[in-house]
């Protein structure tokens, strides 16, 4: 009888542990929730729609234009316009697939103030460190001025920009590194909140997830659109999954 009780207790413990892991994994909509009617990548509509389905965060990309303005866009060259060497006016004249104009960061944040989802701001890697420093300074200043510092997290592939966010953002602001070439120990030494690495990096180094947690950091994986990969990451206990399929991920988490 005792052995039977111990067996069932063990099963319940394992099940409860899996449930806790699932509850701890948060959904980040990659470039917003854009795979739905009336939306487009990095559009204001995508931000609103990510908020409407209660995503933890909505990820978006930022460039500094030739006239030192901040705009929201992923590609360095989009619809024939090169972001770094074009003016704000030239960039924002681009029409997105849902009919919106490409937004400025200020426009994007103005809408975000009306919402609850967290802002996962990626600064794109620019041609020079000087450009990145100017961009970081402007971003941090704008975020603070608009009262969004407590809801904003920063991510970047650039080592320089990463260190600048850590240096210039308010103490305790989460800053994650994207490239995938630094160990958990190195990220901790930098002062990062943790890695935001491609799924393939964690497949190669699954031990890094536990190492990060042991060091007090959090773990984000991108861009995860396959159900099996989502299941694996949830089982490994990652804190965040960035996806183009936020509804699918939410459904999987609900079943846990």
Predicted features, each with a name:
Residues 8, 20-256:
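Phosphate-group recognition and catalysis centered on beta-loop-alpha active-site segments
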Residues 1-2:
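N-terminal secretory signal peptides that target proteins for export/translocation
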Residues 5-16:
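Sec-dependent N-terminal signal peptides
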